[in-house]
Regions:
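Small-residue-biased structural context
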Residues: 2-173
Length: 173
């Protein structure tokens, strides 16, 4: 009988969303860095498609995936991570800049979503968005995250909250 209980417990543990389970073993900055790496790969894929003058539907599908991923990522940072960083008195100027960068990215995302992949500047908008995001990521990972690690933030607890909210938002996409 004890064996049956163990296998049932393992099955229910396996049903946890992977991001939530992973978050329990990491900290918030690592979770956010994973998102950064994932979206960077998608931008590289997009550039290859654009260079190869790939089918518009294929480019649009990838651009939509990028936009959705970035929208969810920005939301969890704005709702959870940035307020926690402000509370821990991490550099307010750096956080202000990050929020302005998010606003610029959201504007480009809205432009991309309103365009057709056949529009003259479609590829340019997606590529420029990638460049904006690359700059934003460099500042977060190079300046903000180290300051957050030194501040009195519960990064493990934040990772769990970020992963849960991300799962909720991804379910809506």
């Amino acid at each position: 009988m004890a064996t049956a209980k163990k296998s049932t417990a393992k099955k229910s543990a396996a049903k946890k969303p992977a991001t939530t389970a992973r978050a329990a073993k990491t900290d918030a900055t690592v979770l956010l860095q994973r998102d950064h790496a994932d979206v960077k790969k998608l931008f590289k894929q997009y550039e290859k498609l654009a260079d190869a003058e790939a089918d518009g539907e294929e480019r649009q599908a990838l651009a939509s995936q990028i936009c959705a991923m970035l929208t969810v990522h920005a939301t969890i940072e704005e709702e959870i991570f940035y307020p926690a960083a402000r509370e821990a008195e991490v550099d307010d100027d750096l956080l202000d800049e990050a929020e302005v960068e998010h606003a610029s990215a959201k504007d480009l995302i809205a432009q991309i979503q309103s365009m057709s992949p056949d529009d003259e500047l479609y590829d340019a908008n997606v590529i420029v968005l990638g460049e904006y995001i690359d700059h934003h990521v460099q500042e977060e990972e190079g300046e903000m995250f180290p300051k957050c690690r030194r501040a009195k933030m519960d990064l493990a607890e934040l990772a769990t909250a970020l992963a849960q909210r991300k799962a909720e938002l991804m379910a809506e996409v």
